[in-house]
């Protein structure tokens, strides 16, 4: 089967979901405990880690991590630009969080953990992901967080 440019959106999302659920610091922050089971970590996708922007306004409010992958431009016949946008957000009543080696509010610390994890990865594109921006975001009247944008060039199609 011939590969498509859009196929890498799903590939990046699959890799991100796997990487983020395997990180003990990220899972500990989301689960709000240091000691958690593998089953609890495996339960995070689609409950607190989403491969799309999602704000659950109906259920219990929890800290969440969302991400989206885009192809903003295809500058040459061989290379395309990939963009990963990540949102780390918490309810206003869950802002305090402490973890050795990290500073800030819960969304700040989660954003820092995400950046450290992605910066160390070589699973995306050609070279390292480049952090383009980190901005604050009020997602609705109950949630505050950070939006991060990463970019990396990648081959137009693979295979």
List the model feature ranges, each with a label.
Residues 1-76:
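Small/polar-rich, solvent-exposed N-terminal microdomains that initiate assembly or binding
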Residues 73-79, 139-143:
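Short, solvent-exposed beta-strand/turn "edge" segments of beta-rich domains on protein surfaces
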Residues 28, 104-159:
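Acidic-leaning, charged glycine-interspersed low-complexity segments
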Residues 3-4, 95-105:
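Short, flexible/disordered intra-domain loops and linkers
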Residues 70-72, 87-91, 151-155:
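Solvent-exposed residues in well-ordered beta-strands and their adjoining turns
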Residues 65, 82-84, 146-148:
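Hydrophobic residues positioned within well-ordered beta-strands of beta-sheet architectures
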Residues 75, 92-96, 156-158:
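Residue-level signal for secondary-structure boundary sites
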Residues 81-98:
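Short acidic, glycine/tyrosine-flanked loop/strand segments centered on an H-E-D-like triad
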């Amino acid at each position: 089967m011939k590969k498509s440019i859009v196929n890498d959106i799903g590939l990046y999302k699959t890799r991100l979901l796997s990487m983020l659920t395997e990180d003990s610091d990220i899972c500990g922050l989301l689960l709000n405990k240091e000691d958690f089971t593998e089953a609890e970590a495996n339960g995070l996708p689609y409950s607190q880690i989403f491969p799309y922007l999602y704000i659950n306004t109906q259920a219990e409010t929890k800290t969440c991590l969302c991400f989206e992958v885009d192809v903003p431009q295809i500058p040459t016949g061989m290379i395309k630009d990939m963009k990963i946008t990540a949102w780390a957000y918490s309810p206003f009543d869950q802002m305090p969080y402490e973890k050795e080696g990290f500073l800030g509010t819960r969304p700040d610390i989660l954003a820092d953990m995400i950046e450290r994890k992605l910066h160390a990865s070589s699973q995306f594109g050609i070279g390292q992901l480049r952090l383009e921006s980190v901005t604050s975001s009020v997602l609705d009247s109950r949630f505050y967080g950070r939006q991060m944008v990463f970019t990396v060039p990648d081959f137009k199609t693979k295979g």
